[in-house]
Swiss-Prot record:
One of its GO terms (cellular component) is extracellular region. Disulfide bonds join 37-60, 46-72, 50-74. Residues 1-23 form the signal peptide. This is Defensin-like protein 281. It is found in: Secreted.
Length: 78
């Protein structure tokens, strides 16, 4: 009886940890460091940088704190 309870608890914990979609929102890369996009660093170069560090893809978008500045963002590895 106790082993069944522990197996169910283990299953719930693993399913929560392995649920896809938890890291699909764009985040600055690396966290805390904003790479500005502009004439010298385009969306194509941002994508190349992000895929080189192991992320799925990258793109340039307005910065969260300063919307007038465009920053490089990467999608999570999931």
């Amino acid at each position: 009886m106790a082993s069944t309870k522990y197996l169910v608890l283990l299953f719930i914990c693993l399913s929560v940890l392995l649920t896809p979609g938890l890291g699909t929102d764009p985040v600055p890369t690396p966290p805390g460091l904003h790479i500005p996009c502009g004439k010298g660093f385009t969306s194509k170069e941002c994508n190349k940088y992000c895929t080189g560090v192991g992320y799925r893809r990258g793109y340039c978008a307005p910065d969260e704190e300063y919307p007038q500045i465009s920053s490089c963002y990467c999608k999570w590895r999931i």
